[in-house]
């Protein structure tokens, strides 16, 4: 399988498959494909993994697209302005990603639930108690909001991240929550009560425009039920 990622900031990944190669995706992620791509909806791992995907923000079922009788093509477009990034997954090299980041993968990649070790990280970190874990062996495509900045953290090196900007990290990183010090900072700083702290070793991917931040910015401009139009 080979691929091209085109069209940022409204990207699409176009995958060209050999005969009998398979791509796995979430419900509704397919954008266009050749007629010989056969779709099969599956639980892909049984009841346990179905509910694990549901808890991590994904659909309980997944779609498998297989190229039948020869080469085929299938495309997956991002649902929000941002970028699509490829991740090579290998045994022992997991990727932990924000909820709803998974777009598509080859058949060797497993998507499961990731429980943060420190419960406070889930309740106060802004991205929920559960994240996504990608493991196995294959190629995965993740979609992120806005521009992506990557950092390589040395052992013990830390990065303090505002809520929602953590897009993904390698499984070797540790995640915890740090309280913003000082009542004045909390009340007047406008940055909330907590920050996410990621500790290396490992790689971290940050996104520049989390959809939650964008929603908060435009919410004051959305008409409510009491809004009335002036007509002539």
Q: Where are the language model's segments positioned?
A:
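Composition-driven recognition of glycine/serine/threonine/acidic- and proline-rich low-complexity segments
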Residues: 1-232
